[in-house]
Amino acid sequence: MLRSVLLATALFAQTVPATFTTIAKGDVSGQQTARQVTVRTAAEWAALWNDHAPTEKAPAVDFSKNMVVGVFLGSKPSAGHEVEILAVRPMGADLVVEYTQKQPARGTMAAQILTEPFHLVSVPAHAGPVRFQLAGSL
């Protein structure tokens, strides 16, 4: 009985979403190429932020307790594109970041301007691998 309870507890603990806080989200970034990022140190954060928004001061992150994960969609030809991190959860030794991408609906009007959608979040520090999964592909 105890073994069953411990197994159930371990399985539940691996699927409980981690808390996360949005640091920045928008459609203007210096990141022209689509990429997913995992940032574990202040030096990595300063470098990423300098590429992302060189004229703005990087938001403070306590890397002794947290890390940053994010998704950049790269350059898009119109408004209406969006990326959103939906959940961050441990799965075994990995931390899985689930996100969604949106684009303008077919046949709708969208401003013809270049955009660079992104979403950056702070999560509790995790030493293991980080995997990014497009929603629905878990």
Show the residue positions of the predicted features:
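Sec-dependent signal peptide recognition
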Residues: M1-A8
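Exposed, flexible binding/inhibitory loops of compact, secreted disulfide-stabilized domains
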Residues: A13-L138
